[in-house]
């Protein structure tokens, strides 16, 4: 991109330097030959010369006449030495073409003295220079010169754009505010800086939006345009050609001087000090080059110089035209479809403004300029590089609306943030800055709460209650008493299962458990201790088997048969002393002491060969039923003497059985059997004993149906049991089998049935079949 800027700088360097190509004073013959080589129509004999010395002031009519008339029309020119005649610029136009709608200055509005001031250049060239300006434009153009220097500096285009626009703003402010600047000075300054005004003022919003993209894509665009326009090859060829021609010219001049005798010493140009011909003082190589530069060129040299100038200018204009087309198309493709057109307008707008100001000289300049430079003098050829008026207005409107929308969005966001969070003077959110706002402490604020307090707050809803365990009464153990540590650990083991009834919700189950926890928290002597079992069966053919004991070996698989349906489920085995083993997959415990709740269905079993005595039994009924007529049940079960029932305690719902010869069993005393009917018509069988070896196979036979499952054993001496909402047991070791015996506890749920109960009682007694009578109308016991 810097190469593009350099190219534009070379194209318009005559506007910033008073005499970029100094032409020495030469003879009229040489000048005429020089001009005829460049201009075929130039007359052979004319007194017109390019002079550097000031000439007498001539009128505008004379200047125009000398440039336009032919040799045959020269005698008709009238000279006005003292008077000045105003000429209408419109009558001098050769190409009457409409100007671009983007041109701010029309040809008719140009200053009338502009042509005269341009024609009265001291060096004979129509060049506008900063040095020829008055005090106002000269002093205010310092920033503009700095802006031209910024073009060649190595920096990003974003920074270059910012600095150039800053320099231009300072310069235009100086021209507008300086009282020494008149209208003509301001008009000239605006013409020269019209491209910068378009970039920094008119289309400022568009360039602000696209300059970042221009900077990102400039490297790729420059490489592609250099290849397309062959700029590097052109400049390299001209450099080599110029150096080669200079070397040849120096050698030819030395040889010609030695051959003609103009140089006394043919090798004088190689010596540091040598005398010139005719006794003139001479120097070395540098003096010879200086003399060659000062010597008037011959007609052949002048013709070759003009030819070289035309060729170089032609190539330069061709590259400029190619680069303008290339950067416009490449940047339009990459940057929002308009960046290339905007840049092209910045480059060519000063040319268009100059064409409109110097419209009277465009035909003359067109005759001197090569064909490839036609767009510099012809407004029609320049139009292809300019932006369309409609597109220019649309870009202004589009970017103005875009900026306005962004401003509205930012304002709306600021208002929302201001209402949500107050800000201090630095824009930092301060939620506690305003006193009227109530500060809200974050639960994760470590400065307010410690980690321990956070943990307690998180689990504050999961409250626990102390587990109450009844005292040890009437318990005889054949094993040593557990240690204090084992006893304390065993009290925390909870092996009570709370089945999920199909018709009951979790809240109802929890409420039921809470009501029963206070009534059945402690039992009679020997309650919830020793070896035993708990068998429950659901109405849908599923159940869980649970057994707890403190002494004895409680491990294995429990098989039981019920009265109706098939019940299979996985149980759990645990204990404190010689306890069984089992794997727990998931346990959700709701603590309660001494309560069992069973699922719907019924389960029954006979305890025999269990190494336990039934001399001292306790029978408990819970739920909607009661423990009425328990004596009748036992009397009917034995067929002989009815056992004596004695309450185990005042607050207990169990009874102690004084019985002798009631069935056959081996083992120690102190077994307690609990039989409960839940409020939802569900039942659960639980048996616990204090001593005995409950190992081996237990078989429980019933009248109809089978109930089998992997059982569970847990507990310790005088240990209460809690309610488990869900227990999944993976495995348990050992097989337990119950065989029927006398004095069997029987329970019927509301959803189950008591089929073949006579057969159960007959198998239990071995003799007479007792008569079954309902205890009450609402009761399910017999």
Swiss-Prot record:
PANTHER family attached to this UniProt entry:
CHONDROITIN PROTEOGLYCAN 4, F18A1.7 PROTEIN-RELATED
Does the keyword section mention Signal?
A: yes
Region described as Disordered? 513-726
List the coiled-coil residues.
none
On whether Magnesium is a keyword of this UniProt record, the answer is no
Biased region (Low complexity) positions are: 520-532, 548-566, 573-612, 662-672, 688-722
Question: Could you identify this protein by its name?
Answer: Chondroitin proteoglycan 4
Report the InterPro entries cross-referenced here: CPG4 (IPR029153), CPG4-like (IPR053123)
One matching Pfam family, short form? CPG4
Q: Could you tell me the keywords of this UniProt record?
A: Glycoprotein, Proteoglycan, Signal
Known glycosylation sites: 76, 208, 462, 468, 474, 503, 559, 691, 699, 701, 704, 708, 714, 721, 743
Q: Which gene encodes it?
A: cpg-4
The region annotated as signal peptide is 1-18
């Amino acid at each position: 991109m810097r190469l593009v800027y350099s190219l534009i700088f070379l194209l318009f360097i005559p506007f910033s330097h008073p005499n970029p190509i100094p032409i020495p004073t030469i003879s009229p013959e040489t000048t005429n030959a020089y001009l005829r080589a460049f201009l075929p129509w130039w007359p052979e004999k004319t007194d017109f010369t390019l002079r550097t010395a000031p000439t007498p002031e001539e009128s505008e009519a004379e200047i125009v006449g000398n440039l336009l008339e032919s040799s045959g029309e020269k005698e008709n020119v009238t000279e006005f030495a003292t008077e000045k005649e105003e000429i209408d610029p419109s009558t001098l136009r050769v190409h009457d073409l409409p100007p671009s709608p983007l041109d701010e200055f029309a040809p008719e509005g140009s200053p009338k003295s502009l042509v005269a001031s341009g024609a009265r250049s001291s060096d004979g060239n129509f060049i506008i220079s900063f040095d020829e300006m008055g005090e106002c434009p000269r002093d205010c153009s310092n920033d503009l010169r700095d802006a031209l220097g910024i073009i060649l500096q190595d920096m990003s285009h974003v920074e270059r754009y910012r600095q150039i626009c800053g320099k231009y703003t300072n310069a235009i402010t100086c021209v507008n505010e300086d009282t020494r600047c008149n209208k003509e000075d301001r008009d000239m300054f605006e013409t020269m800086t019209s491209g910068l005004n378009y970039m920094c003022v008119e289309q400022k919003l568009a360039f602000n939006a696209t300059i970042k993209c221009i900077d990102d894509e400039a490297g790729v665009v420059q490489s592609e345009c250099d290849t397309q326009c062959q700029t590097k090859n052109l400049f390299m060829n001209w450099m080599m050609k110029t150096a080669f021609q200079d070397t040849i010219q120096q050698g030819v001049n030395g040889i010609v001087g030695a051959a003609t005798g103009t140089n006394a010493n043919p090798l004088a140009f190689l010596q540091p000090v040598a005398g010139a011909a005719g006794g003139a003082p001479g120097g070395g190589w540098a003096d010879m080059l200086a003399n060659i530069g000062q010597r008037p060129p011959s007609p052949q040299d002048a013709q070759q110089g003009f030819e070289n100038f035309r060729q170089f200018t032609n190539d330069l204009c061709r590259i400029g035209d190619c680069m303008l087309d290339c950067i416009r198309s490449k940047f339009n493709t990459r940057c929002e479809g308009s960046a290339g057109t905007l840049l092209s307008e910045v480059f060519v707008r000063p040319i268009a403004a100059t064409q409109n100001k110097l419209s009277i000289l465009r035909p003359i300049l067109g005759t001197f300029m090569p064909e490839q430079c036609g767009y510099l003098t012809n407004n029609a050829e320049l139009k292809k590089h300019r932006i369309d008026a409609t597109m220019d207005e649309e870009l202004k409107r589009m970017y103005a609306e875009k900026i306005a929308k962004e401003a509205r969005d930012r304002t709306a966001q600021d208002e929302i943030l201001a209402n949500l969070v107050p800000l201090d003077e630095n824009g930092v959110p301060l939620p506690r800055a305003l006193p009227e706002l109530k500060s809200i402490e974050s639960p994760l604020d470590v400065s307010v709460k410690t980690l321990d307090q956070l943990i307690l707050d998180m689990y504050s809803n999961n409250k626990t209650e102390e587990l109450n365990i009844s005292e040890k009464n009437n318990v005889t153990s054949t094993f040593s008493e557990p240690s204090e540590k084992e006893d304390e650990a065993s009290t925390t083991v909870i092996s009570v299962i709370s089945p999920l009834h199909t018709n009951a919700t979790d809240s109802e189950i929890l409420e039921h458990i809470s009501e029963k926890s206070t009534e059945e928290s402690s039992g009679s002597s020997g309650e919830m201790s020793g070896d035993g079992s708990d068998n429950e069966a659901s109405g849908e053919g599923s159940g869980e088997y649970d057994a707890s004991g403190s002494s004895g070996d409680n491990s294995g698989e429990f098989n039981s048969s019920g009265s109706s349906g098939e019940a299979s489920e996985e149980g759990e085995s645990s204990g404190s002393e010689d306890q069984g083993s089992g794997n727990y997959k998931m346990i959700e415990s709701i603590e309660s002491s001494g309560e069992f709740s069973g699922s719907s269905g019924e389960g029954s079993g006979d305890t025999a060969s269990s190494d336990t005595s039934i001399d001292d039994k306790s029978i408990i009924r819970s739920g909607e039923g009661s423990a009425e007529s328990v004596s009748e049940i036992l009397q009917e079960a034995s067929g002989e003497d009815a056992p004596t029932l004695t309450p185990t305690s005042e607050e207990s719902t169990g009874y102690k059985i004084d019985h002798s010869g009631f069935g056959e069993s081996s083992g120690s005393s102190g077994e307690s059997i609990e039989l409960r009917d839940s409020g939802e018509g569900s039942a659960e069988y639980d048996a616990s004993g204090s001593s005995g070896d409950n190992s081996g196979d237990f078989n429980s036979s019933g009248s109809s149906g089978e109930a089998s499952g992997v059982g569970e054993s847990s507990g310790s001496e005088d240990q209460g049991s809690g309610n488990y909402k869900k227990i999944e047991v993976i495995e348990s070791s050992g097989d337990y089998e119950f065989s029927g015996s006398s004095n069997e506890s029987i329970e019927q749920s509301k959803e189950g049935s008591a089929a073949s109960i006579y057969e159960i009682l007959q198998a239990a007694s071995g003799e007479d079949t007792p008569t079954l009578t309902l205890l009450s109308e609402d009761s399910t016991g017999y």
